[in-house]
A protein has these predicted regions:
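Structured, helix-rich domain cores that form ligand/interaction pockets
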Residues: 1-179
């Protein structure tokens, strides 16, 4: 059920340099303060290294598996955190979760568009139907407290060149996310 996660871990003098474990790490210098920040990725996760800490953002499911069709539970999330800790050579068990998105896929009998057209209004949220296979519910005010998204996961996977697991090639996959 866990989808995208945002993690923050404090950085001290004893924290090893994790930039050497990142893909395409780039340094950015603030010419006013002299602070050097490093931005890179690790198997699809966005990793940002600041003076005070390390930020990690992305889908732990995509990090653990070749796609995010299978949602993570508490056990597989712990496996993903352990793999990430091993890859960066730091302990992330005490990292703070600063953001968490929930989502899952439903295998439907009919095309996803048939179901999206049946979903009605939600209290205090506006309905946005951007294209045939995507539906969002967003807050009416300026604050974006939560967003609900429903979309065709198979079409999304094809657009992102993501391989679907065996047996899902012909499935109608309705993805639900709470962001």
């Amino acid at each position: 059920m866990y989808d995208k996660v945002k993690l923050w871990t404090a950085r001290t003098r004893e924290t090893p340099d994790v930039s050497k474990f990142l893909d395409r790490a780039k340094d950015q210098i603030d010419h006013e303060t002299g602070e050097v920040c490093t931005f890179g990725s690790l198997e699809g996760l966005k990793v940002s290294i600041y003076t005070g800490g390390i930020s990690i953002i992305g889908s732990l499911a995509k990090y653990l598996y070749p796609n995010n069709i299978y949602p993570l539970d508490r056990h597989t999330t712990a496996q993903a955190i352990e793999k990430l800790s091993d890859s960066l050579h730091i302990n992330l068990n005490d990292a703070k979760v600063t953001g968490l998105e929930f989502g899952t896929q439903f295998v439907m009998a009919h095309p996803v568009e048939n179901y999206l057209s049946k979903l009605g209004d939600m209290p205090k949220l506006l309905r946005y139907h951007f294209d045939v296979g995507t539906l969002y519910y967003k807050p009416k005010g300026k604050q974006q407290l939560k967003v609900f998204a429903f979309y065709d996961k198979k079409a999304d996977a094809v657009a992102k060149n993501m391989a679907l697991p065996v047996g899902f090639d012909e499935a109608n996959l309705l993805k639900y996310e709470m962001r």
